[in-house]
Amino acid sequence: MAAPLRKEHPIFRILNSTFVDLPLPSNLSIWWNSGSLLGLCLVVQILTGIFLAMHYTADITLAFSSVMHILRDVNYGWFLRYVHANGVSLFFICMYCHIGRGLYYGSYNKIETWNVGVILFLVTILTAFMGYVLVWGQMSFWAATVITNLVSAIPYIGTIIVQWLWGGFSVDNATLTRFFPFHFLFPFIIAALAVIHLVFLHNSGANNPFAFNSNYDKAPFHIYFTTKDTVGFILLVAALFSLALLFPGALNDPENFIPANPLVTPPHIQPEWYFLFAYAILRSIPNKLGGVIALVAAILVLFLMPLLNTSKNESNSFRPLSQAAFWLLVAHLFILTWIGSQPVEYPYVLLGQVASVLYFSLFIFGFPIVSSIENKIIFS
């Protein structure tokens, strides 16, 4: 009897080993859906972005008007724009769930997969920031001015790099025209990095909630996990369409519906909600260079997780102290997100400083110390 085409054809064979016959631990929970949801979000963002780019004009005199043209005059342009604008919020929600699952269940022990994932996170942040600038509303313009100006804190070469980024001595037409092609290009780089991420993942094998050896109990990806992923897809699309159709501007800053004006500063400059935790850490340090270092360290600290891990048990499923530390970290992230949306005044500055110190303390001291204590309790 001839083998199925999916097992014989050189291209289909690769797809088959990735999406059909891939053996996975049978006890994977719903938290393992976030990876496939990220893939769906990326596809949606690329497709809607391509159609939006057909009608967008990367010029400071026309950028805001071209966005309004898309909303008013292009067939279903309003739908494309709001799906794209709200899709990035769901993208980051899925990404934070994915990172949180990795921290909780010890995915950082698969070092290559974890490091590529953190790089993916960084590239996604850059992509989203440049896309936010393209609207050329008030908050877009001033956020671009403030965030890019932080690079000037780098000793000796900072000012030169900022002027190179701007294409002049301020955020202007050159800045917008170079941000647009980079924003168009980066999603394809993200897709390539995602493939590398999957290659490393399939090479090392997926972990599972209990961190047990799963070689004795595995199930094929299709039809068990494709069915579960499909349920996640339906829920994600329902959430995205609900946002785009019923609450299209709920997650956008009202200031961004005003055309950019370099002569009028908004009362409170802030990035989109998914960057607020990092923004709160940035402004909690009064020194400019110190704030930039803290901002970058808030993301790069994820690279240190494999080195800081002291636990003999990979997963947190049977480690109550580590579970408490993890949820304390999640609470701090919510607090920092809330503080980032508040004015720079007492008591928000003080709360931000305390939450920032605790954020880094949990990563550098909290998790290793708690894991060492659990090792003594469990294995002594």
Swiss-Prot record:
- Cofactor(s) required, per the database record: heme b
Which Gene3D superfamilies does the protein's record reference? Cytochrome Bc1 Complex, Chain C
Q: Where does heme b b566 bind?
A: H98, H197
User: What membrane topology is annotated for this entry?
Assistant: Multi-pass membrane protein
Pfam families per the record?
A: Cytochrom_B_C (PF00032), Cytochrome_B (PF00033)
PROSITE patterns attached to this UniProt entry: CYTB_CTER (PS51003), CYTB_NTER (PS51002)
Where is it mostly found?
Answer: mitochondrion
Free-text remark on how the cofactor is bound: Binds 2 heme b groups non-covalently.
CDD domains in UniProt: cytochrome_b_C, Cytochrome_b_N
Keyword entries, A-Z: Electron transport, Heme, Iron, Membrane, Metal-binding, Mitochondrion, Mitochondrion inner membrane, Respiratory chain, Transmembrane, Transmembrane helix, Transport, Ubiquinone
Superkingdom assignment: Eukaryota
Q: Which GO terms describe its cellular component?
A: membrane; mitochondrial inner membrane; respiratory chain complex III
Kindly list the positions annotated as binding a ubiquinone.
Answer: H202
Query: Which GO annotations describe the biological process of this protein?
Result: mitochondrial electron transport, ubiquinol to cytochrome c
Residues reported in the UniProt entry to bind heme b b562: H84, H183
Note on file? Heme 1 (or BL or b562) is low-potential and absorbs at about 562 nm, and heme 2 (or BH or b566) is high-potential and absorbs at about 566 nm.
What does this protein's UniProt record list under function?
Component of the ubiquinol-cytochrome c reductase complex (complex III or cytochrome b-c1 complex) that is part of the mitochondrial respiratory chain. The b-c1 complex mediates electron transfer from ubiquinol to cytochrome c. Contributes to the generation of a proton gradient across the mitochondrial membrane that is then used for ATP synthesis.
Assembly mode: The main subunits of complex b-c1 are: cytochrome b, cytochrome c1 and the Rieske protein.
- What name appears for this protein in its UniProt entry? Cytochrome b
Q: Give the organism, scientific name.
A: Strongylocentrotus purpuratus (Purple sea urchin)
Phylogenetic placement of the source organism: Eukaryota, Metazoa, Echinodermata, Eleutherozoa, Echinozoa
